[in-house]
Structures are given as structure tokens and as C-alpha cells.
A protein has these predicted regions:
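Juxtamembrane intracellular "pre-TM" segments in multi-pass secondary transporters
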Residues: 11-30, 219-264
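Extracytoplasmic gate region of multi-pass secondary transporters
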Residues: 54-58, 257-305, 309, 371, ...
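Central cavity-lining transmembrane alpha-helices of secondary-active solute carriers
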Residues: 74-91, 302-315
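Conserved MFS/SLC helix-loop-helix module at the cytosolic interface between two early adjacent transmembrane helices
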Residues: 85-123
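Cytoplasmic membrane-interface "Motif A"-like loop-to-helix N-cap segments
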Residues: 95-106, 320-335
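C-terminal ends and interior cores of transmembrane alpha-helices
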Residues: 107-121, 334-351
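Cytoplasmic helix-loop-helix junction between adjacent transmembrane helices
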Residues: 129-167
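Helix-loop-helix hairpin linking two adjacent transmembrane segments in secondary transporters
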Residues: 164-220
């Protein structure tokens, strides 16, 4: 059955009128319907691109605006909470329409992303401006799936929703592609994040112009009815002439706050925790856990979102062909659960780039297989209660998913509290460690470094005067004896001829006159006698000192340093000697670098040790979310077996023909 499209825009003529009055009085032919669906998907992709663009440069934003990871996550959390109430406002589109909201939102967000947010120079300006954008996008991202539903009968609903769900994923994919191709491996400045926002905003303005010129929507009398196949078109247009819109829209939330709507919305929201974690933190996760550059982390996003897009569209086509949704949700949930467990176990290990790429691709395929049929089934469940309240049902879902994200992002910094040192300091610490390997050695030998710092003056002297230290070591006995017998040696040095003459005699044969002279030279009286006795008793030690007197004289200028060096424990000297090359290299590190490492290296090392386990815990929570989703599937409308679904479609077609016959008989 066919029908011609009458005046397409509610009887309005002229360019200006068409920019304001966008309602179609009759259901469009297939070509125009596909065009409007494609335009809605384009708007959705653009809105999500603008929403997610910060993820590609999140590490640069944190560093440039001096944000902690916790502050960043809390910002995202409250952004979603604010967007949740924007989503509730979007429920009014059941009464006032969708297209103008989408067009306004595209213009508003493009201006903010291109020109306002990039001018933020502190974290509070960035946050508040992001909140404003979040409210507008919360409204638009409920209006767009409502438009998708309006232009797609149930028989093609999964395919249409598959294309719509490509919106967030294609938005993520564009973020990753643009980021991996425009963000250098080593950005020249942390302010480079504004570059990505400028690109995104300019593209957004182009999409706004296209939508402003061409986007349309169905009139309320057309969209507020259930359409199973395109063959229902004539019946819908006939019924539209007598539909009571006010009655259909009375007490909308009371009509839809039911277990099948609410629990299903909660379930898919917790299933998508892993998706929103990837959107917000994939770059942070890959750079801090596996050490990838921002460029390579965005490259992994290409794999994740590219495969997700293919899965979303393919499963939509297959679900429509087989006429069932639930088996695909189960299959996708199981695949997602298994792959996510394998993926989370990689933390703390060293998987290759392509190992992670394949896991991300498979995980995204599983989520896509589950999500597209859920979107189709959810809108069909809402239609089963009241087809006039699609936007209200999607607003409830939009509110719930943003509240769930808000709560999860509040929880995330509690579970993962190790990211801030890695994001804020990890890059500099790693770069310094690569440039100065001795810093890495110092980190693994703290006691050696501490001892070297404690005795730095003594060890520095030893390193600068190795021959002096070697001589002092060689003549250590003589040096000790020189100090011990200093008075005796002073007397001998002052009276060399007298002691040379005395050396010709034994102590018992020295002439009395010579003995008297010796006693007088030694200080006279008992003092002189005692000193001579000491010389006589320690003749060998004193002779040893005299034998190397020239060598000891060369060491005399360093006596203070050698005395201080003698106070250093031998074990410290041994360790310093064994590690002299490393300590010498460490001494050449600029003081500013050493100070930075001293302030932050320990925190970075501790965080790096804790972070993999904390991320695993979070991903286990995400696994639980997918399992809860699997348990909720029976609540949704729809058959499990294709033959049962085909029978329902045949019965509906018979009803349509009967209704058309009645309308024809009464006209």
C-alpha cells in the first residue's frame, strides 16, 4: 500500500518558515525517511564527538589545568548528573517536538566547544563550561533516538537503532582517529588540548548548518502511534486525523514508571559502565598502566570503536531479519563478560599493542551485539505501553543512565586512588629516568644513596683525590703512629744530630753527658726521661714513621679530610667504591631534576605498584554490571524464537488490513 507525501512541512512555505516549522504532515517515502534517519545519526555522531573530545587529550588537560585525577572524575560525574536533568527535560519533546531542540543544541555546543571551552585557563572555568554543554547535550541525546524511532517501523527498528547507537561509538571513533593523527607523540605543550577542541567545534558548526537546513520531524498525530511495518503507513495517516493527543500525553511519567522500563534502563546503564570507562579513561588507563603514548592510546581506541560500529550495524540487520532481540542480547552479554575478564587480567603484565587491540575489538563486538537489540526492544517495550510517550521513555532512560554514570564516577576514585601521581608526575619521572638512568639505579639502592649523601663531603674528597686516599691507606699504620708519637717525633725532628749520635750506642752504653743532653732536649727532668723511655720502647714504630716521612709530609695538607674520611664506616666506603660509576653519574644529574625526583618518584613508584590491582577491581565491578544486564533481559517485550515473532507480525498485518477495511467502510 502506498501514499503520496503531501506538503512536507505543515503547510509552510519559504526558507525562513522551514527553519522554524519542521513538522511533516504525512509519513515520508522511503528515500526521504532514510535521509532524515541519516541526518539524525549525523547529528548524534557530532554531539557525542563534542561530548567525548576531551578523552583524547585527558592527560594534557589534567596537567595543563592542574587537575587531580579525582577532581577530573568528579567533574565528569557531576556533568552526567546535570545532563540527567537535561534528559528529563527532553521528555517534553513528546509534546513540543524534537527537531528544533536538536538544531539549537548543535549550534550551542559547537560554539562552546570551538571557542569557549578552549579559552579556559583553570580547572573551574573548564568544569563550569563543560556543565553547560552537558545540559544541552543531555536534552539533544534523548531527542535524537526519539527521531530515529519516529522514522523507523518496528520491523526495521533494530537496524535503525543500530545506526543510532553508532552515534556514540562513531563519536568515540572520530575522537580516537583525530587524536591519533593530530596529537604528536610528544606534544610541544600541555596546552595542545585546545587544538582538538577547535577542530571538533568547527566540524560541529558545519553539521549545525546541514541540520538547520534539512532536519524534519513527524507531526504529533503521526508519531504518537505504533508502526510495526511500512505497510502500516496508510493506517497511521488515517488514524492521525482523529487522534486525541492530549489524552495520550496525560500523566506521562506515571504511565511509564514500571518495572520493565525502569529495571531495564538500570540494567543497560550498568552494562555500559565498561563503555563509559573506556570513553573517559582509555587514554589514562593505557598511558599509566601499559606506558603507551597518548598517540598510541588513541590508536587503540580506533580498534575498539571501529569494530563496535560494525557490530552495531550488523547485529541490527540480523536482528530485524530474524525478528528477535533477546537471543542477541544474551550472546553479546556472554561475549562481553568473557572478554572483559581476559582484558582486566592483562593489568600488571606486559601485553603487546595488538594483544590489547584484539581484546578491545572483541569486547566492543560483544557490547554491540547486546546493545543494539536492547535499544530496539526498549523502544518497543515503551511503545507497548504508550507509543505517544517514546521521548518520555527515552528521557527516563537518559536520566537513569546519567545518574548511574554519576554514581559510578563518584565511586571510581574511591576504588582507583593511584592515578593522580601517574598522570601528573609519571610522564616527567619516566622522561627523567630515561635521560638519567642513574636515577633508576638510585631508586633501587636507597641505602647506598642515603649513605653517600650523608658522607658526601668525605666521599667526594676521596673520589677527587684517589692517589691521596691510596697513599693514606697504604701508610695508615705510619699515619696512626705519627699521630700517636707526635711529641716524640717532634723532639727527634728538632734534634736530628743528637739522636743520630745516640743511635750509635745501646741504651745502657750511652755516655752520661750525651744522656743528659738527650733528657734536656726532651724537656728535662722526669718529663724528658719519660719521653726518651717512650722512644726507646717504640723504636720500631717511630723508625717506620721516619722512614716514610716524605710521603707523610705530602699527606699533611689533607690531614683534616683524611681524619673525616677515617670516621666513615668501612662498609660505606666499600659500597661507594663498588658503585662509584653510578654515584658519579648521579652527581651529574641537574639539581632541579634530582629535587623533582625526590619529591615525586616515590609516589609514582607506589602508585604504579597499586594501580593495576585497583583497575582490576573496577573492571570486576563492570563485569557484575554485564551480568545484571543478562538477568534483566526477560523483562523486555519481544520473542525468543524467530517463528513466534513471525507469527506475531502476520497477526499484526491481518489487524492492519481489518482496520483499513473498517476505515474505508466508514469514510
Amino acid at each position: 500500500m502506498t501514499a503520496t507525501t503531501a506538503d512536507p512541512v505543515s503547510g509552510q512555505r519559504g526558507l525562513f518558515s522551514s527553519l522554524i516549522h519542521r513538522q511533516l504532515d504525512s509519513y515520508p517515502d522511503t528515500g526521504m525517511r532514510v535521509f532524515y534517519l541519516a541526518l539524525t545519526v549525523l547529528a548524534t555522531v557530532m554531539l557525542y564527538y563534542e561530548l567525548y573530545v576531551g578523552g583524547s587529550v585527558s592527560t594534557l588537560i589534567l596537567a595543563n589545568l592542574h587537575m587531580s585525577f579525582t577532581f577530573y572524575v568528579i567533574t565528569l560525574a557531576f556533568g552526567n548528573l546535570i545532563g540527567a536533568f537535561g534528559s528529563l527535560f527532553a521528555g517534553l519533546t513528546d509534546r513540543y517536538g524534537r527537531a528544533n531542540l536538536v538544531v539549537f543544541g548543535l549550534f550551542f555546543t559547537a560554539i562552546f566547544v570551538a571557542f569557549v571551552i578552549p579559552n579556559a585557563t583553570n580547572k573551574w572555568a573548564f568544569t563550569i563550561e563543560g556543565f553547560v554543554v552537558g545540559v544541552v547535550e543531555g536534552i539533544c541525546l534523548v531527542a535524537t533516538p526519539a527521531l530515529i524511532r519516529d522514522f523507523s517501523p518496528q520491523v526495521g527498528r533494530a537496524t535503525a537503532m543500530g545506526f543510532w547507537t553508532c552515534g556514540p561509538v562513531l563519536g568515540s571513533l572520530i575522537v580516537a582517529i583525530v587524536g591519533s593523527n593530530t596529537v604528536p607523540a610528544v606534544p610541544s605543550s600541555t596546552r595542545f588540548w585546545t587544538h582538538e577542541y577547535h577542530i571538533c567545534g568547527i566540524v560541529g558548526l558545519v553539521v549545525f548548518v546541514i541540520a538547520a537546513l534539512f532536519l524534519r520531524e513527524l507531526s504529533p498525530r503521526l508519531r504518537d502511534q505504533l508502526m510495526v511495518t511500512m505497510r502500516d503507513r496508510a493506517l497511521i495517516e488515517a488514524r492521525a486525523k482523529g487522534i486525541d493527543i492530549e489524552a495520550a500525553l496525560r500523566r506521562p511519567f506515571r504511565q511509564l514508571v514500571k518495572p520493565d522500563v525502569i529495571i531495564s534502563a538500570i540494567a543497560v546503564s550498568v552494562m555500559l559502565l565498561i563503555y563509559y570507562t573506556a570513553v573517559g579513561f582509555l587514554v589514562i588507563y593505557m598511558t599509566t598502566i601499559f606506558g603507551f603514548s597518548v598517540k598510541d592510546a588513541n590508536g587503540l581506541g580506533n580498534w575498539e570503536w571501529g569494530f563496535n560500529v560494525v557490530a552495531l550495524i550488523a547485529v541490527g540487520l540480523l536482528s530485524d531479519r530474524l525478528r528477535v532481540r533477546k537471543p542477541f542480547m544474551v550472546l553479546g552479554g556472554i561475549i562481553g563478560t568473557v572478554i572483559l575478564v581476559i582484558y582486566l587480567l592483562q593489568a600488571g603484565h606486559h601485553p603487546s599493542y595488538y594483544t590489547l587491540a584484539i581484546l578491545l575489538a572483541l569486547l566492543s563486538v560483544g557490547l554491540g551485539i547486546a546493545y543494539t537489540p536492547w535499544m530496539a526492544s526498549f523502544t518497543e517495550t515503551v511503545e507497548d505501553r504508550n507509543p505517544a510517550l517514546i521521548a518520555t521513555g527515552l528521557a527516563i532512560w537518559g536520566w537513569i543512565i546519567r545518574v548511574i554514570i554519576f554514581l559510578s564516577f563518584i565511586l571510581l576514585p574511591v576504588v582507583i586512588n593511584s592515578v593522580t601521581p601517574l598522570v601528573n608526575y609519571g610522564g616527567t619521572v619516566a622522561a627523567d629516568a630515561a635521560q638519567y638512568p642513574s636515577l633508576v639505579w638510585a631508586g633501587s639502592h636507597p641505602t647506598v644513596v642515603a649513605a653517600a649523601e650523608k658522607y658526601s663531603t668525605q666521599l667526594g674528597f676521596a673520589a677527587a683525590h684517589p692517589s691521596v686516599v691510596a697513599a693514606a691507606t697504604k701508610y695508615s699504620t705510619q699515619l696512626a703512629n705519627a699521630a700517636k708519637f707526635a711529641p716524640e717525633l717532634a723532639v727527634i725532628e728538632k734534634n736530628p744530630a743528637l739522636f743520630a749520635q745516640a743511635a750509635k750506642y745501646t741504651p745502657t752504653t750511652i755516655p752520661p753527658a750525651l744522656a743528659a743532653k738527650l733528657i734536656a732536649a726532651a724537656g728535662g727532668g722526669s718529663k724528658g726521661t719519660a719521653l726518651l723511655g717512650t722512644i726507646d720502647a717504640n723504636q720500631a714504630a717511630i723508625s717506620g714513621v721516619i722512614a716514610v716521612s716524605s710521603q707523610l709530609t705530602a699527606l699533611a695538607p689533607y690531614s683534616a679530610q683524611l681524619k673525616a674520611l677515617a670516621a666513615v664506616p668501612p662498609s660505606v666506603i666499600a659500597e661507594a667504591t663498588a658503585n662509584s660509576a653510578e654515584l658519579a653519574a648521579l652527581a651529574k644529574v641537574p639539581p632541579s631534576v634530582s629535587a623533582y625526583m625526590a619529591a615525586h618518584a616515590s609516589a609514582v613508584t607506589t602508585a604504579a605498584a597499586k594501580s593495576p590491582g585497583q583497575w582490576k577491581t573496577w573492571y570486576w565491578i563492570c563485569v557484575g554490571g554485564i551480568i545484571f544486564f543478562l538477568l534483566s533481559i526477560p523483562l523486555l517485550r519481544g520473542r525468543w524464537r524467530p517463528r513466534d515473532a513471525k507469527r506475531d507480525e502476520e497477526e499484526h498485518e491481518a489487524m492492519v488490513q481489518a482496520e483499513l477495511a473498517k476505515l474505508g467502510a466508514t469514510s
